């Protein structure tokens, strides 16, 4: 870009803004003499995961032991990096009590490695010792505190309520269970493969960590900035170009990032000031970035790291299948947000940027090799290679690409910094996965999932729409304030069973709860991504949240469409059906988006807006040719009326 505006946030301001709205970034800025210890442990942790990823060097290692190294080391780093309160971020050094907690947390988890044969053998016959239970208790408490520091309070509240339910929920009407004492619940949560060391932490230790490190490597090679430049070069000259570029950039960033708030701050620190300068309202600028960044969590191939866990939860599909299935819904979402920015720009007469302020597309195309790491991963996944192997090749491709430009060439210090940053980025995800395991464990041990499913089915009766509506509300409430991986784990274990019990295909049910858990980040009143964007835009947070909700309305409609018609998820459908469904869905989304933005081809007359909304809903109505046909005719009618009125006004203006 030829110009950097004075309102664009510096790196320090970005970090402060991110820490304000995202607990994951609120770590100590100056650990003092402990800095080298933190670096050594973090670098070692990343090297451990790279070593484990190579089948030739990794060798056999029981997954509980790998998970213990993964989680134990992460907990130690969290206590060394994250202060008790945010006010401790700027204090120099690490307090003695956090050092103590770091060693205690590491020791309690490493205890599993030392006593592995006992825990998996004789202890299950003769019973666990008092020491075993004490260590497990310490480990659980310290895990919860570490998660509070690195992730936030919402997931801790849910996990704590789960533990209390496991202990005291025996007499709750309808939701009662057989009951557990502290010893029984603790050993199940800490020493089995169904809770803390269950699927989420196993996936985190094998796949997620490597893909997060891949994202760090892309940042080091300048791919993130290339995404921004490519988006502005391709869309910046059109009507409302700055907002369209923000949407496109966030879609590209979302392919490799795992946090809507982090994406909002990283991209928004540049795009939001640009949108304001182009005369977009501050609330809209914040909303556009927040809705696009939130959409990044549903963008393949990473999908906020939830895709890996979904592939394990959904028995009928592989990870590469999940990636392919997620493409059409994600494109529909971003197309809808893109159209929303267009309608807003047309309504307020906001034009594109002059050519002098845009990067040269010729120059950008000469740097197309920067996309090689991403293309490498996607290609290998499509060809059927494992995610681990694909991630390794992607990391190698990123390292190779870094040498193409002098300012991105990675020396020893750059490599060490990348290894450390890989661990830092992974810490909140690891803590969230482990704590989500507590929630899953309680659901499994008490049968709570079946009870919730039964309750939702009773409320809905035989009405699928009502069941989806109640499930949507549950997912949004459960997803508020949770990171993407934990968000999906919680909603999948507590909400998806109801849809599956009703007969909804397993893939569609899991995508449904995943989508609604994600859009919680832009659903008032707890819309963290919108709040982060409003902080950059200096806008009213609630107005930004409401506007983001309007822009991202597709995210609230698409899940209903693919439950009623799984062809949108490429399930049991021929190519003709899929193409027709996508076309009608796009037209429907355009109509709904125009209604939300209060502008279509021209300003609405009082009757046109509700009719256009009706046409949009009819166009996305599932598997009914007559209703969809009627919606198309109504859409064409409104578009024709508006076009003729606009043409008449334009002619009169030209004559004058």
What are the residue ranges of the model-derived segments?
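Conserved, well-structured core domains of diverse proteins
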Residues: 1-126, 133-137, 646
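Long, contiguous bundles of hydrophobic transmembrane helices that form the permeation core
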Residues: 2-36, 324-425, 528-617, 646-656
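Membrane-water interface regions at transmembrane-helix termini and the short interhelical loops
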Residues: 53-58, 81-92, 119, 138-153, ...
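Alpha-helical transmembrane segments
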Residues: 66-72, 202-212, 321-336, 386-395, ...
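Core transmembrane alpha-helical segments of multi-pass membrane transporters/permeases
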Residues: 107, 145, 150, 160-175, ...
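Membrane-interfacial loop-to-helix junctions in multi-pass transporters
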Residues: 130-134, 194-207, 233-247, 278-284, ...
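Transmembrane alpha-helix interface/packing and boundary motifs in multi-pass membrane proteins
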Residues: 148, 215-219, 250-259, 291-297, ...
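Hydrophobic transmembrane alpha-helices that form the pore/transport pathway of multi-pass ion
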Residues: 228-296, 302, 306, 484-516, ...
């Amino acid at each position: 870009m030829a110009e950097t505006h004075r309102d664009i946030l510096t790196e320090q301001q970005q970090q402060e803004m991110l820490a304000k709205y995202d607990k994951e970034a609120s770590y100590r800025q100056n650990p003092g003499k402990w800095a080298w210890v933190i670096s050594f442990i973090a670098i070692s942790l990343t090297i451990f995961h790279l070593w484990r990823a190579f089948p030739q060097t990794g060798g056999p290692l029981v997954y509980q032991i790998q998970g213990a190294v993964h989680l134990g080391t992460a907990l130690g780093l969290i206590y060394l990096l994250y202060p008790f309160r945010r006010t401790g971020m700027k204090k120099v050094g690490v307090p003695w009590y956090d050092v103590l907690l770091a060693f205690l947390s590491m020791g309690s988890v490493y205890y599993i490695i030392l006593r592995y044969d006992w825990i998996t053998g004789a202890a299950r016959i003769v019973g666990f010792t008092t020491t075993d239970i004490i260590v497990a208790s310490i480990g659980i408490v310290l895990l919860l505190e570490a998660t509070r520091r690195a992730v936030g309070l919402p997931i801790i509240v849910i996990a704590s309520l789960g533990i209390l339910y496991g202990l005291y929920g025996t007499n709750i009407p309808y939701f009662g269970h057989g009951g557990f004492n502290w010893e029984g619940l603790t050993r199940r949560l800490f020493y089995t493969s169904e809770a803390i060391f269950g699927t989420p932490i196993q996936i985190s230790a094998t796949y997620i960590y490597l893909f997060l490190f891949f994202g760090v490597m892309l940042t080091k090679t300048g791919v993130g900035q290339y995404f921004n430049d490519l988006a502005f070069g391709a869309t910046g000259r059109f009507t409302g170009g700055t907002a369209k570029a923000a949407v496109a950039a966030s879609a590209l960033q979302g392919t490799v990032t795992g946090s809507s708030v982090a994406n909002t701050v990283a991209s928004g620190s540049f795009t939001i000031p640009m949108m304001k300068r182009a005369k977009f309202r501050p609330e809209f600028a914040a909303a556009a970035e927040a809705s696009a960044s939130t959409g990044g969590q549903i963008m393949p191939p990473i999908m906020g790291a939830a895709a890996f866990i979904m592939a394990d939860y959904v028995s009928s599909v592989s990870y590469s299948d999940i990636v392919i299935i997620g493409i059409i819904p994600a494109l529909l979402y971003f197309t809808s947000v893109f159209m929303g920015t267009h309608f807003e720009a047309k309504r307020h007469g906001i034009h594109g940027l002059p050519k002098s302020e845009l990067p040269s597309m010729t120059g950008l195309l000469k740097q197309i090799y920067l996309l090689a790491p991403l293309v490498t991963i996607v290609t290998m996944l499509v060809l059927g290679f494992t995610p681990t192997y694909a991630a390794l090749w992607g990391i190698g491709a990123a390292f190779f690409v870094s040498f193409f430009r002098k300012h991105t060439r990675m020396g020893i210090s750059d490599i060490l910094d990348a290894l450390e940053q890989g661990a830092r980025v992974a810490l909140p995800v690891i803590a969230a996965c482990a704590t989500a395991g507590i929630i899953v464990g309680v659901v499994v041990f008490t049968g709570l999932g079946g009870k919730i499913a039964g309750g939702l089915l009773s409320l809905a009766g035989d009405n699928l729409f009502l069941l989806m509506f109640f499930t949507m509300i549950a997912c949004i409430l459960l997803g508020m304030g949770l990171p993407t991986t934990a968000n999906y784990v919680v909603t999948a274990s507590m909400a998806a069973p109801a849809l599956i019990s009703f007969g909804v295909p397993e893939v569609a049910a899991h995508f449904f709860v995943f989508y609604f858990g994600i859009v919680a980040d832009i659903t008032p009143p707890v819309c963290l991504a919108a709040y982060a964007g409003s902080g950059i835009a200096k806008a009213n947070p609630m107005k930004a949240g409401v506007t983001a909700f309007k822009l991202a309305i597709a995210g609230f409609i698409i899940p209903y469409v693919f439950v009623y018609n799984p062809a949108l998820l490429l399930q049991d459908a021929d190519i003709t059906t899929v193409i027709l469904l996508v076309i009608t869905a796009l037209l429907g989304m355009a109509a709904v988006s125009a209604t939300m933005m209060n502008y279509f081809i021209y300003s609405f007359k009082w009757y046109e807006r509700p009719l256009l909304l009706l046409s949009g809903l009819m166009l996305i109505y599932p598997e009914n040719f007559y209703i969809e046909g009627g919606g198309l005719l109504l859409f064409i009618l409104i578009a024709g009326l508006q076009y003729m009125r606009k043409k008449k006004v334009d002619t009169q203006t030209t004559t004058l």
